[in-house]
A protein has these predicted regions:
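Substrate-binding cleft of secreted/luminal carbohydrate-active enzymes
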Residues: 422-433, 450-504
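Low-complexity, acidic Ser/Thr/Pro-rich repeat tracts that form intrinsically disordered stalk/linker regions
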Residues: 23-69, 75, 83-84
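Active-site-adjacent "subsite" loops/lids of carbohydrate-active enzymes
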Residues: 249-254, 290-298, 303-345, 474-476
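Boundary/entry segment of secreted carbohydrate-active catalytic domains
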Residues: 243-273, 310, 393-397, 459, ...
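Beta-strand-rich structural segments
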Residues: 65-86, 128, 161, 165-181, ...
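Aromatic- and acid-rich polysaccharide-binding/catalytic face
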Residues: 277-283, 348, 352-353, 405-434, ...
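Enriched for extracellular/lumenal, surface-exposed ectodomains of secreted and cell-surface proteins
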Residues: 98, 123-143, 193, 216-238
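Aromatic-lined carbohydrate-recognition surfaces of secreted/lumenal glycan-active proteins
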Residues: 251-255, 305-309, 370-407, 450-461
Length: 504
């Protein structure tokens, strides 16, 4: 086989002309360490001294590249593969011609040569050439390089209603999105708050979150995303206001009549810090009498929360219309009720009970959405008028089934609440003391901010209201606390031996 003269003539011609795009489109060249080779430098004599043609016994080579897409402002890799009879050719020089300029790269052990280059927006033809050697014939090829505009991004606060309070470990969430609003997944976001740095990777919807445990005050949280092809960098900041801490969550639920019978002095002596007073007390005794009693309790160091029933009034009330959509009018009335009690003088908090479906949530598409909406709305409206009001909710003690049966989405609800109180009534569930520990651990792990104060049954069960002994109450309370609870709430005054919380 004779070495064709025409190949070198064509190679010289190609190397001497420009590619599709003009030379002024090249913005930067990265990692180009080899000298630029001019076509005429590679011309070799193609005839022997006696004027005869040299017989070619060399192997053929193949130089193959693929069409590539890159982005302006980012480097683009143009990679080719040099092979001969199925074998990779290593340590061979390959010439790339892009936008009128030539660059030389050397193949690696796999026969690959890569040019790393920055180009402006446009479409380019990249030529690549292997000029052959003593053993191998030359080869060449070309591919299209398409350079697109980079993708602009922004970082947005995902939820401005999240609750921050000293003593809580509250979630802080941002979302990385494109200019069209699509979430960007798998990217690292860096946070800086109170001279500490954190990082988190965005999920499939573009959300990145960290947890903040801060003392009372106002903090500037900054967050940023560094450019990562094809996405451009973005950043932002947000002020977080952290409220004052809560006292220990040790106390009791109490029916309205308790304000006439309970001994506040005795409760104080036993370390009681919280009483959840049923709102019916206002109907039964009037606002003046109740507020006077609340003031008296406060003198004993006991905080009073108004215990409000939400979606149960002798029967279950669905926060949904007949067509399954959210009943905003109903929920607005219920929110107003919660806000009303929060504004009463001396009230430390509002406690929402029956904040759920009665075991039928799975029958309605929007059940979870309705409960989440109500919790977020109620918390936001209360904090407009009483920023430091403690907002709590009673929840069912079934961590894996709360959403399915009751519409209680714990990770979402706990972003807004200060406290959740799982009603871990072991007698009703035919469970033992260890179960209380398990329940508390599960809810602590699911919380995105709210503390867990565990609600325990002070009597054997609803079928047997025999009071549990003080020693048994202590064991139950300790089990809750070892599970991560920050307090224990007993159900209830009137059917309980008073617990000495100092022994817990």
């Amino acid at each position: 086989m004779k070495r064709p003269l025409i190949f070198l003539i064509l190679a010289l011609a190609v190397l001497s002309i420009s590619a599709v795009s003009g030379a002024d489109n090249v913005t930067d060249i990265e990692s180009v360490s080899d000298d630029v080779i001019l076509a005429e430098d590679v011309v070799q004599d193609i005839y022997s001294a006696d004027g005869g043609e040299i017989e070619n016994t060399k192997s053929d080579s193949a130089l193959v590249g693929k069409d590539t897409t890159g982005y302006e402002q980012f480097s683009t890799d143009i990679t080719v593969s040099l092979m001969s009879n199925g074998t990779a050719l290593a340590s061979k020089q390959v010439i790339f011609n892009v936008d009128g300029k030539n660059y030389t790269k050397t193949t690696d052990s796999a026969g690959h040569a890569t040019l790393n280059i920055k180009l402006s927006n446009g479409i380019y033809t990249a030529g690549f050439f292997f000029l052959g050697d003593n053993d191998t014939n030359p080869s060449n090829g070309s591919s299209l390089i398409t350079i697109k505009s980079p993708v602009k991004t922004s970082l947005k606060i995902a939820d401005k209603d999240i609750n921050y309070r000293q003593g809580l470990k509250s979630v802080f969430i941002v979302r990385l999105v494109t200019s069209t609003g699509s979430g960007v997944s798998g990217k690292t976001v860096t946070f800086n708050v109170n001279n500490k740095k954190y990082s988190a990777v965005t999920d499939k919807k573009g959300y990145a979150q960290i947890f903040l445990s801060l003392k009372k005050g106002t903090y500037r949280v900054s967050y940023s995303f560094s450019s990562d092809c094809p996405y451009l960098s973005s950043s932002g900041s947000y002020n977080v206001k952290v409220k004052s801490p809560m006292s220990k969550g040790n106390g009791y639920w109490m029916w309205a009549g308790g304000i006439k019978t309970v001994n506040l002095k005795t409760l104080k002596q036993k370390g009681t810090k919280q009483i959840f007073l049923n709102s019916y007390a206002f109907d039964l005794y009037g606002k003046k009498t109740v507020t006077s009693w609340i003031a008296k309790a406060k003198k004993y160091g006991i905080s009073v929360h108004i215990w409000v029933q939400i979606f149960y009034e002798g029967k279950w009330i669905k926060p949904l219309k007949s067509d399954g959509s959210l009943d905003y009018n109903l929920m607005k009335k219920k929110v107003s009720k919660v806000v009303y009690y929060s504004k009463i003088k001396g009230v430390a908090g509002v406690h929402m009970d029956y904040l759920r479906f009665g075991g039928t949530a799975h029958k309605y598409d929007n059940s979870v959405k309705a409960i989440n909406y109500f919790v977020k709305k109620a918390c936001a409206e209360v904090r407009k008028v009483r920023p430091n009001c403690i907002i709590s909710a009673a929840i069912m003690p079934e961590p894996e089934m709360n959403k399915y049966y009751y519409g209680q989405d714990i990770p979402t609800m706990t972003k807004y609440l200060d406290v959740i109180i799982p009603m871990a009534y072991k007698g009703n569930y035919h469970k033992n003391t260890k179960w209380l520990n398990t329940v508390c651990k599960s809810f602590v792990s699911k919380s995105n901010g709210a503390q867990v104060w565990c609600g325990i049954q002070a009597y054997k069960s609803d079928n047997d209201i025999t009071r549990l002994s003080h020693s048994q109450l202590v064991k139950d309370a300790k089990s809750c606390m070892s599970g991560g609870a920050k307090g224990v709430v007993l159900f209830r005054i009137g059917v309980t031996n008073l617990l000495n919380f100092y022994k817990v």
